[in-house]
UniProtKB/Swiss-Prot annotation:
Protein name: UPF0178 protein BB_0029
Similarity comment text for this entry: Belongs to the UPF0178 family.
Top-level taxon: Bacteria
Species for this entry: Borreliella burgdorferi (strain ATCC 35210 / DSM 4680 / CIP 102532 / B31)
InterPro entries associated with the record: UPF0178
Disulfide bond sites: none
Length: 143
């Protein structure tokens, strides 16, 4: 079981953050939502909102192998995986050594070519992403 869950809130779906808040009420872990801007979030004993200038550095300093980080940032995910931290995105994709190098390479090419990828989702797909997140989150949390 994981001791801390960090959320890179600047790129995370708010519905996922709300799910994690409810989940953490029944578990002994700590949810740390990190953002570079303040937003409305119910703070409880197990939930903390940290507003910092550099989200990645803040998480990097506190995360360990008993932590899970939720982020969409592939470059940050690779760095965390190299340190033994569990990482997934808010769509339910679990990052690991089998997929991160390809995703990192692809992101680096897109960045160098200044290619921005926009994703458009319909409501049904959003529901499937949410369900995939929950399923994969449970598998990581309780492993």
């Amino acid at each position: 079981m994981l001791s801390k869950i960090f959320v890179d809130a600047d790129s995370c779906n708010f519905k996922i953050i709300k799910f994690l808040q409810k989940f953490i009420l029944h578990n002994k872990s700590k949810l740390i939502v990190v953002s570079n801007k303040f937003f409305s979030l119910e703070i409880t004993e197990n939930v903390a909102l940290e507003v910092v200038d550099n989200v990645d550095s803040f998480i990097l300093n506190l995360a360990d192998r008993y932590s899970l980080v939720i982020t969409r940032d592939i470059f940050f995910a690779k760095l965390l995986l190299d340190l033994g931290v569990k990482v997934m995105n808010d769509e339910g994709r679990i990052f690991d050594i089998n997929n991160i190098n390809y995703l990192y390479f692809r992101s680096k090419i897109n960045f160098n070519l200044k290619i921005k990828i926009k994703k458009y989702y319909d409501e049904d797909f959003n529901k499937s992403r949410y369900e995939k997140f929950i399923t994969n989150f449970y598998s990581l949390f309780f492993s």
